[in-house]
């Protein structure tokens, strides 16, 4: 089976680069420093307009932080899912937990029903759930198509033992997609160890600002941002290294 590469794309242009590099699919996100949040209508529509072959999955996450949502946040998620259906994207990506760290089955069912017929991926909320094997069976029963996971570790290489066990237990009933720390120099090891066929990675490079006048004394965001005059973007050449 051919290796399937999903790129975590932070913009419409990153989707263009991912397609040019040969990726199968993107997960389109805003708010990368927060772990990914729902992109805007304009970003999704532009990504669709500028690409023709790549599948676009859109993350549905109204904020950073935990995965315990208020009803107001759920309403926002439902509206964003409806928008994604109108824009005819390939799929949506979300995950919801209870206060006790279990999959919020009723809420996930509600969102999955709203998303039909789009593909549904459970994102790395899975990595902070209490019992991954119970969660696996619940997500299969709910009809999720895939789980994005680092094996409940800080990166997918460290999570190899759990991901391999998840692939084994899933037995083809759901796709287990390793992500977080997947690089061109370790994807072969992860593939061989886990038996996974779909992989999630960023494949980004820094894009430097073309601003000539620069006031570097006034940051626009968090102090962890290294410079106001650089961003990151999917790099088509890096994508090619995974194919």
Language model regions located:
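Catalytic cores of alpha/beta
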Residues: 10-20, 68-81, 127-142, 166, ...
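Glycine-rich phosphate-binding active-site loops on the catalytic face of alpha/beta enzymes
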Residues: 25-37, 83, 87-99, 144-157, ...
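C-terminal alpha-helical cap/extension of soluble enzyme domains
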Residues: 170-243
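Glycine-enriched alpha-helix->loop->beta-strand junction motifs that scaffold or abut catalytic
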Residues: 19-26, 51-53, 88-91, 114-118, ...
């Amino acid at each position: 089976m051919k290796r399937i590469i999903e790129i975590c794309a932070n913009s419409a242009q990153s989707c263009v680069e991912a397609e040019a590099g040969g990726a199968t699919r993107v997960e389109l996100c805003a708010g990368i420093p927060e772990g990914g949040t729902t992109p805007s209508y304009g970003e999704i529509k532009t990504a669709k307009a500028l690409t023709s072959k790549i599948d676009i999955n859109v993350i549905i996450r109204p904020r950073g932080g935990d995965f315990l949502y208020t009803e107001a946040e759920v309403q926002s998620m439902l509206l964003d899912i409806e928008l994604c259906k109108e824009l005819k994207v390939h799929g949506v990506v979300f995950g919801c937990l209870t206060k006790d760290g279990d999959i919020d089955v009723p809420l996930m069912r509600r969102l999955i029903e709203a998303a039909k017929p789009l593909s549904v991926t459970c994102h790395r909320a899975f990595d902070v759930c209490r019992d991954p094997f119970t969660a696996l069976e619940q997500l299969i029963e709910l009809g999720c198509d895939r789980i994005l996971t680092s094996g409940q570790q800080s990166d997918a290489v460290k999570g190899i033992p759990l991901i391999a066990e998840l692939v084994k237990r899933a037995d083809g009933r759901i796709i287990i997609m390793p992500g977080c720390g997947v690089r061109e120099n370790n994807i072969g090891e992860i593939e061989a160890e886990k038996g996974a066929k779909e992989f999630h990675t960023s494949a980004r490079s820094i894009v430097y600002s073309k601003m000539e006048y620069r006031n570097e004394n006034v940051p626009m965001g968090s102090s962890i941002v290294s410079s106001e005059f650089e961003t990151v973007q999917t790099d088509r050449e890096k994508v090619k290294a995974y194919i």
